[in-house]
């Protein structure tokens, strides 16, 4: 729905703000917040919005150049010398069968791979609950 991505990003930032005091020794605050802001940046190109109706649909043109919004965000961050943020974006879906470029089921991944996935998942799960409450 129109505004859903902004709401989701805002929720992710709020979760990060709440979690950071517990995690501050394990993760850089700027990197955490940047990853929360950028993890779905490719969605602004992956989907089209009809601003009159608010209807959102998949942009078929996106597939010509990109595999997914995660790939777009990963590439954007790698191009701008931000590999840690890129890796957080690559793993934010958690599992390869859910669209993650890096599967969190792999062994010996660094801690920061997991945090944006869990933040994103919380926002997505609670967002669905609240939207269903509106119906």
Label each region the model flagged.
Residues 14:
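Regulatory/sensor and coupling segments of signal-transduction and defense proteins
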Residues 7-8, 19-132:
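Divalent metal-dependent catalytic cores for phosphoryl transfer on phosphate-bearing substrates
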Residues 1-11:
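All-alpha helical catalytic cores of prenyl diphosphate-utilizing isoprenoid enzymes
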């Amino acid at each position: 729905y129109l505004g859903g991505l902004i709401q989701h990003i805002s929720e992710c930032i709020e979760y990060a703000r709440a979690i950071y005091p517990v995690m501050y020794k394990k993760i850089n605050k700027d990197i955490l917040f940047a990853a929360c802001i950028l993890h779905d940046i490719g969605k602004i190109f992956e989907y089209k919005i009809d601003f009159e109706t608010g209807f959102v649909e998949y942009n078929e043109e996106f597939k010509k150049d990109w595999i997914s919004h995660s790939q777009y965000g990963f590439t954007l961050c790698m191009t701008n010398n931000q590999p840690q943020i890129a890796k957080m974006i690559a793993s934010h879906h958690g599992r390869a069968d859910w669209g993650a470029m890096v599967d969190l089921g792999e062994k010996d991944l660094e801690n920061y791979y997991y945090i944006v996935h869990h933040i994103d998942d919380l926002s997505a799960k609670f967002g669905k609950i609240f939207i269903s409450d509106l119906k």
